[in-house]
């Protein structure tokens, strides 16, 4: 996937039958802040929610709230799934995305 990446990124990848079905790059910023942006899930509806529901707990475990502020630029269609993992909407909203934090 054509993303710029480096040592400051941690990638969480969902694989099914040797095929990548989703990924979430998390950029580690200064002062224990991490940002989810440009994630991809190769599904819609309940399958999409299921894939994200496998990826998000791994991210939350890696970036624990006691140590990290975790922000996300979340697709509006995924907002409910992120809320299940205690992400909260911020005031910032675009047409297709909403900024969230945990």
Describe each region flagged by the PLM.
Residues 1-11:
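Active-site rim helix/loop that mediates acceptor-substrate recognition in acyltransferases
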Residues 13, 18-27, 35:
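Conserved beta-strand in the GNAT
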Residues 15-17, 99-102:
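Active-site beta-strand termini and strand-to-loop segments that position acidic
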Residues 32-44, 95:
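Conserved acetyl-CoA binding element of GNAT-fold acetyltransferases
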Residues 46-61:
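Conserved acetyl-CoA-binding loop-helix of GNAT-fold acetyltransferases
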Residues 61-74:
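Conserved GNAT acetyl-CoA-binding A-motif
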Residues 74-94:
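Conserved active-site alpha-helix within GNAT-family acetyltransferase domains
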């Amino acid at each position: 996937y054509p993303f710029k990446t480096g040592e400051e990124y941690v990638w969480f990848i969902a694989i099914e039958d040797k095929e990548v079905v989703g990924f979430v790059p998390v950029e580690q910023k200064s002062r224990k802040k991490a940002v989810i942006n440009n994630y991809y899930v190769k599904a819609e509806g309940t399958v999409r929610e299921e894939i994200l529901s496998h990826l998000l707990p791994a991210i939350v475990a890696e970036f624990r709230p006691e140590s990290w502020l975790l922000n996300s630029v979340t697709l509006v269609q995924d907002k409910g799934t992120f809320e299940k993992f205690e992400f909260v909407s911020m005031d910032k909203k675009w047409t297709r995305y909403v900024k969230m934090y945990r």
